[in-house]
Amino acid sequence: MITIQPFENQDTDHIVNLILNIQQNEFQVPITINEQQDLLNIPSFYQHGNGNFWVAKSGEEVVGTIALIDCGENIGTIRKMFVKKEFRGKEYGIAQKLLDILEESSRENNIKNLYLGTLERLQAAIRFYERNGFTLIEKQNLPSVFPLMPVDTHFFEKEI
């Protein structure tokens, strides 16, 4: 059974391992933990204001993540959307459940617009966001409060 819950400190190592494995080994993204200090300090980076970091688990195994940064001005940024390869697809619906929880939390907390950045090579993710009502936008149309990641090439927006 898949459960989704807010981040707890004991999950840190499992989250880091999941995300780095997907980034480096599955998609050959040239990024290290040193460039993602947010993963070593999740509570202070994500769990303030109306932001949060959710973890999907199968039993005790971390199999997915999603994070919301509260940027102020009724703007939220989606980060760290990852699902372990063996748990992807409609059979599990983990990515959809994670996004639904994030959007529900955003609406409850008066966040009106969501933004995210991703990589061109992550075509399944791009299709997922488009199916969920996100619109591709130019980098220069991002709000000034959007936290840019150097590796991102595609940017999306959704009014909720």
PLM-predicted stretches and their roles:
Residues 1-3:
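Extreme N-terminal starter segment of soluble prokaryotic enzymes
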Residues 108:
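Terminal helix-turn-helix DNA-binding modules in bacterial transcription factors
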Residues 91-93:
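Glycine-rich phosphate-binding loop
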Residues 112-115, 119-123, 127, 131-160:
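C-terminal "cap" of GNAT-fold acetyltransferases
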Residues 6-86, 96-101, 105, 142, ...:
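Acetyl-CoA-dependent GNAT
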